[in-house]
Amino acid sequence: MSGEHTVHEIVTNFLLDTCRLRPLLSRHAVQAAGWCAELATDHPGDDAEADFIPLTTGSVAEFYIEPMLPHVGDVDVMTYRSTELAIPRGHPPPTQLPAEFSEYVKVHEIVDSDFPGYVYLVLRYLLTECTDDGTCRYRCFAYDTGNKQYLSVSTRPAANTQSIHGPALLTINTFFLSLDHVPCVRCLSWPPQAADWPTRHRNYRWPDSATVGRVVSNGCDVVHVAHRQCRQDEWESKLQWRLSFSRA
């Protein structure tokens, strides 16, 4: 028991010493913020009204080990469009959305594939913003379910400094940390595919119930990447997505 208690203390001290938010702004945090600002000022080529909403994830966001450079080689930034949203299949569309979403939002249902964690996104609703008694809400219009429209992404490097890295588009930079840019679709609900995670048995009572509740309330994201058995398939490679819990 004493040995187990010692291990518990070592793990706890490591997490407390390395996984808190940085108390001071570092050069790497500034570079991450710079990448976020650059992505946020861009607009999708097929939708000038849409905004990219950035979120820094990965080691730069999670650790404050200094110096950071030996441990981190790039900045991971996820971006989702302000005009797109994913919801679990069978869930009703939301009537209210966070302020960063646009006046119109396309809502895609998350449909399971044959591989756990990998899904398809099927266009289901169009939400349009309206004001009722001073309250901003969204009116819902349903698409024809007889003609399924699958959301697809064809990610191609835009320059010699870019390459595909899993679900990310890797941008090499010789002066700053390189950028791993992961386009995604925001899901405000916790997906039923991970329904057992909040009640899963946890050693050492970590994460605690408050942290679990906070993670679940943040929902998840859906990133464009196909299962390894489907990446050579012309259809599946473009239409298959994967659930991501990086914002946790």
Q: Residue spans of the language-model regions?
A:
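Non-catalytic helical "accessory" subdomain of NTase-fold nucleotidyltransferases
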Residues: 1-248
